[in-house]
Amino acid sequence: MAKGTYEGNKTHVNVGTIGHVDHGKTTLTSAITAVSSAMFPATVQKVAYDSVAKASESQGRRDPTKILTIATSHVEYESDNRHYAHVDCPGHADYIKNMITGAAQMDGAILVVSAEDGVMPQTKEHVLLSRQVGVNYIVVFLNKCDKLDDPEMAEIVEAEVIDVLDHYGFDGSKTPIIRGSAIKAIQAIEAGKDPRTDPDCKCILDLLNALDTYIPDPVREVDKDFLMSIEDVYSIPGRGTVVTGRIERGKIEKGNEVEIVGIRPTQKTTCTGVEMFKKEVVGIAGYNVGCLLRGIERKAVERGQVLAKPGTITPHKKFEAEVYILKKEEGGRHSGFVSGYRPQMYFRTTDVTGVINLQGDAQMIMPGDNANLTIELITPIAMEEKQRFAIREGGKTVGNGVVTKNIRII
């Protein structure tokens, strides 16, 4: 299964592409891997457009009965200073909620905007969602600049993007905006050009430099107890079951005992292998890894559970929380709600319906309010105090919360 060992000599950073459908997110993802693999052939593999697209499409066709279907593709690449894990998020409006999990894993995002089309509906939605889920750093790639008849159009679109970033709480004037053509960069690499000197590859080098300099080195909680939210589950013939996800804290290595917590009764097992991009690793906080589990059947584990050091986290259905309900201008509800309200609660990699009950003398919670609430989920999930979550309804985020007290252990 593994093809080598990841040495981890460079700082590891998680990024991803966001933006409107057909603006070139997947093409840019492929272009970055093409340029990076030409510069670092020993450690980076070029990922063709079709491979990135098919990964998203195949995941998008997963079981429709599941609570949350994620259509994303994971690739890796390097700059001179960093190792990047990159998630390519879908841009269709129907998949907008899928970005929550992808975006929640990002230390920064690459916003792709077509210079031909300018800012479009999903451009704004993805920027808003990035702000809501805590992605604090965005780098902009103005794509398809080779197709512009009038160079001034790029100036107009750039100003439009800055306005959108400012509107949603980012500093548009300080945000790096790189102009270029992802497809031209791919064609240059395919023609055997040197990426460090070819003019069509310069935009990708500039983008990598912007990622290196604008997104700060992430602070990882390596010294805490291991916890990884399960994003996907695979069965490998002759080997067993593999669960994948981003390590939230701590570290894991071959031979460690772990528990699978949430949704189902807690199970204890042993991790018999840890890999990242087909390389054996000691998994540490921030890494997207696959963990091979001993004696666990594929059907016995699912997305939304967590893998954790035994005894460090428990499943809960009922809890108290401090929440902020977004105002209409922030993309939230237009009206208030009362006890009995049943939105979706997004915790880590899953969403669960929860029944909200107001506390004290409160009769109604209005947009813009901070409130203490009691929430009961229909399914127990791994939960701990100070854990953050999003409240979603009708395809949009209507509130953000933090767990203040777990009431009942399942």
Swiss-Prot record:
Pfam families: GTP_EFTU (PF00009), GTP_EFTU_D2 (PF03144), GTP_EFTU_D3 (PF03143). InterPro entries: EF-Tu_GTP-bd, EF-Tu_GTPase, EFTu-like_2, EFTU_2, P-loop_NTPase, Small_GTP-bd, T_Tr_GTP-bd_dom, Transl_B-barrel_sf. SUPFAM superfamilies: EF-Tu/eEF-1alpha/eIF2-gamma C-terminal domain (SSF50465), P-loop containing nucleoside triphosphate hydrolases (SSF52540), Translation proteins (SSF50447). Mg(2+) binds at T26. The keyword Protein biosynthesis applies. GO terms for cellular component: cytoplasm. Residues 10-219 form the tr-type G domain. The keyword Kinase does not apply. Keywords: Cytoplasm, Elongation factor, GTP-binding, Hydrolase, Magnesium, Metal-binding, Nucleotide-binding, Protein biosynthesis. GO terms for molecular function: GTP binding; GTPase activity; translation elongation factor activity. It catalyses: GTP + H2O = GDP + phosphate + H(+). Its EC number is 3.6.5.3. It is found in: Cytoplasm. GTP binds at residues 19-26, 88-92, 143-146. NCBIfam families: EF-Tu, PRK00049.1, PRK12735.1, PRK12736.1, small_GTP. Monomer. GTP hydrolase that promotes the GTP-dependent binding of aminoacyl-tRNA to the A-site of ribosomes during protein biosynthesis. Belongs to the TRAFAC class translation factor GTPase superfamily. Classic translation factor GTPase family. EF-Tu/EF-1A subfamily. This is Elongation factor Tu.
